[in-house]
């Protein structure tokens, strides 16, 4: 019944969206256990550690909306993925690529390319919508998104789901609509007690989006307004254009935003 309350998503031409599920014990185990292993699964022998924000440096919560800038190099590596920046501040003194987080290899891959604690879902459809000005967007404060393995697409619900400190509308694509909603009198309601801190919410995941676009001369829309690109998220949001870092919201932090004009 909950799935009756969905809206149609769009698939922008030339855009590839992928989702990645990460874990340290088992894929369906609780993320926020009191003492999660910091050296198993996706964390094994890695500098970046999935945890509850209690780590050091970029593995620790910044304490608010302030990102941990300078966490990755200013250009993508030769494989097209970020590298952790080598610096005394980061405590990284050697090449530390993040390919393993965002490539197609996962726990089902054979041989040395296998990545423990990860399942990759590539070319996922249906996440985006189009606003009145022709911009493609996804906004978790308007629509809860849930990955559907049967279609390799996203179910977009007509209501935001999961609250954090009183604000409704979080992005947890590996939770189902029935995990976060109840239905009553033909409408969805947020399920009581399901918050961003709940143990039954899948916190450890990644998403990537690559797109080919042309920026028109003068940088204006058909309405003669500046073309802008806006991003908002918590925990490690990086934006690269032509392999160059142009937006840096790295680190474990509350939701922060950036705008590129």
Say what each PLM segment does.
Residues 1-261:
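Acidic/polar, compositionally biased interaction segments
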């Amino acid at each position: 019944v909950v799935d009756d309350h969905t809206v149609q998503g769009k698939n922008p031409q030339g855009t590839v969206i992928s989702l990645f599920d990460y874990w340290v014990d088992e894929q369906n185990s609780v993320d926020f256990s009191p003492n999660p292993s910091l050296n198993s699964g996706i964390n094994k022998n890695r500098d970046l550690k999935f945890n509850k924000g209690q780590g050091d440096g970029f593995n620790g919560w910044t304490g608010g909306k302030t990102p941990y800038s300078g966490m990755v190099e200013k250009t993508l590596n030769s494989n097209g993925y970020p590298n952790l920046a080598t610096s005394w501040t980061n405590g990284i003194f050697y090449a530390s690529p993040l390919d393993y987080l965002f490539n197609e290899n996962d726990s089902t891959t054979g041989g040395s390319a296998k990545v423990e604690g990860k399942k990759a879902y590539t070319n996922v459809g249906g996440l985006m919508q189009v606003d009145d000005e022709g911009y493609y967007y996804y906004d978790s404060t308007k629509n809860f998104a849930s990955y559907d393995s049967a279609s390799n697409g996203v179910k977009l619900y007509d209501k935001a789901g999961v609250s954090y400190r009183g604000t409704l509308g979080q992005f947890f694509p590996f939770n189902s609509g029935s995990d976060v909603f109840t239905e009553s009198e033909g409408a969805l309601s947020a399920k009581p007690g399901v918050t961003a801190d709940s143990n039954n919410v899948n916190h450890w995941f990644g998403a990537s989006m690559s797109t080919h676009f042309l920026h028109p001369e003068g940088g204006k829309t058909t309405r003669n307004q500046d073309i802008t690109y806006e991003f908002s998220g918590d925990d490690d949001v990086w934006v690269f254009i032509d392999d160059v870092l142009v937006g840096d919201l790295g680190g474990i932090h509350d939701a922060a935003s950036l705008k590129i004009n």
